[in-house]
Curated annotation (Swiss-Prot):
Keyword Heme carried by entry: no
Assigned GO CC terms: extracellular region; membrane; other organism cell membrane
SUPFAM superfamilies: Snake toxin-like
Primary localization class, coarse: secreted
Subcellular location: Secreted; Target cell membrane
Domain of life: Eukaryota
UniProt record similarity statement: Belongs to the three-finger toxin family. Short-chain subfamily. Type IA cytotoxin sub-subfamily.
Tissues where the protein occurs: Expressed by the venom gland.
Protein name: Cytotoxin 2
Gene Ontology molecular function: toxin activity
Taxonomic source organism: Naja oxiana
Cysteine disulfide links: C3-C21, C14-C38, C42-C53, C54-C59
InterPro entries xrefs: Cytotoxin_Cobra, Snake_3FTx, Snake_toxin-like_sf, Snake_toxin_con_site, Toxin_cobra-type
């Protein structure tokens, strides 16, 4: 699985066990990602922070 890094032009191959790509952003600014990368379990979103997870190459 390949996931985008914070700079969308770059991607990285996920290590074993981390089979989800995620994008984290502030609810107040939904079009500005704060973090991107590989993760094993999708974190729960909160009132301030939203997580979007997916399991295909560069879907974040």
């Amino acid at each position: 699985l390949k996931c985008k890094k914070l700079v969308p032009l770059f991607s990285k191959t996920c290590p074993a066990g981390k089979n989800l790509c995620y994008k984290m952003f502030m609810v107040a600014a939904p079009h500005v990602p704060v973090k991107r990368g590989c993760i094993d379990v999708c974190p729960k979103s909160s009132l301030l922070v939203k997580y979007v997870c997916c399991n295909t190459d560069k879907c974040n």
